[in-house]
Amino acid sequence: PYIPRRIRVTLSPEEAEEYAAARRMYTNFIRAHQIDFSERDGWTRFIMLSARLPGGRDAMKAYLKQRAIAQCSRAKLNIVWDIMRENRSERIIIFTADNDTAYRMGEIFCMPVLTHKTKAAERKDFLDRFRSGEYPVLLTSKVLNEGVDVPEASIGIVVSGSGSTREHVQRLGRILRAKGGKQAVLYELVSDGTS
């Protein structure tokens, strides 16, 4: 009932350079302080040490920068635009890993954004307008992963995500509700050369 499409995205030379520099700063810090993310307290330890140690704030900023580049590069934005343009008659849900990416894209594309911060009345209004076709596209960061059926959507675009199978299945479920025998498509945008 659906077609999966994975699209590999290449960072621009400038973005690749910025990504590499930020990643290097971040990984140098975690190596120097023997932070192991496979341990239960790895992330907590990184946060604590980045707040306390010299170079820690820079390491945290570098972590956030490399993540932002991988999740929302110019190439990804261009591909999202192309997919929306090619599928004007379809309802589209765009999934992001975090609120910042969703809000950034919402500003760029002038689209409604649903996050956990969206008040219930506004969320209902957005979904009603989406269902009616007034809003052909919705942007969301995880809030539609569970518990909300949007059978009108036939296109999903995963701009960034956790990579977990559970999240993938939940997102796919948002666009695979039976309605008129539609053929749904789930695009997954993956940045090459990023972790």
Positions of predicted regions on the chain:
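Short, glycine/serine-rich, charged loops/turns that create anion-binding
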Residues: 99-100, 118, 163, 176, ...
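Interdomain linker/hinge connecting the two RecA-like lobes of the SF2 helicase core
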Residues: 1-91, 96-97
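A short beta-strand element within the Helicase C-terminal
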Residues: 139, 146-162, 167-168, 183-190
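Hydrophobic/aromatic beta-strand patches that form the interior of the parallel beta-sheet core
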Residues: 7-9, 112, 157, 187
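Conserved helicase ATPase core of P-loop NTP-dependent helicases/translocases
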Residues: 91-96, 100-148, 167-169
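Switch/connector loops and helix/strand junctions flanking conserved nucleotide-binding motifs
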Residues: 1, 17-18, 148-150, 164-169, ...
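Amphipathic alpha-helical transducer elements in NTP-driven molecular machines
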Residues: 13-19, 77, 124, 141, ...
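Conserved segment of the helicase C-terminal RecA-like domain
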Residues: 174-195
